[in-house]
Amino acid sequence: GVRRFYIDYAQKITLRRAKTKLEAQAYASDLISQTAQELNVSIVVLAQVGRAATKNPNGRPEAVDIADCDNWARDCGQLAFLHRPAIDDFHPRNEFGIPLGRDGQPLRVTPAEFLVRLNRFGLGEADVKLGFYGERGAFVSPVLE
């Protein structure tokens, strides 16, 4: 049977009975968490990070940065972020805006990270270095320089 469900873009969930977006998000988060437990399935919910995350001291998103409602972080069993640091922090760009490597050639893979910030079922936090292969829209590992 089905063991995993995916919900793309949590902030698009709306409920007619909710008076505010925050109320709708809090209710949806709780309902999804309960449903996962009752059906004994994993429900992966993709959510947007608020703009304030870019102002974090380390430049990385944290649980409090999930846009519109922090209930998502409280109700989940695992919380992870795919993060692509600002490329300008690492590499210059050519006249077309494409990042360049040390050899002056366009980069095919740019820096990225998979950040585990909560894991109630495992080892806890982790930072995994990845690369983002833009031509294919894929995250790859390990990062080769």
Predicted regions and their residues:
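Short, active-site-adjacent cap segments at secondary-structure transitions
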Residues: 12-14, 50-54
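Helical hairpin unit composed of two closely spaced alpha helices linked by a short loop
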Residues: 2-45
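Short, ordered loop/turn segments at secondary-structure junctions
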Residues: 10, 48-49, 84-85
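C-terminal regions of RecA-like/P-loop NTPase motor modules
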Residues: 1-2, 19, 31-39, 52-145
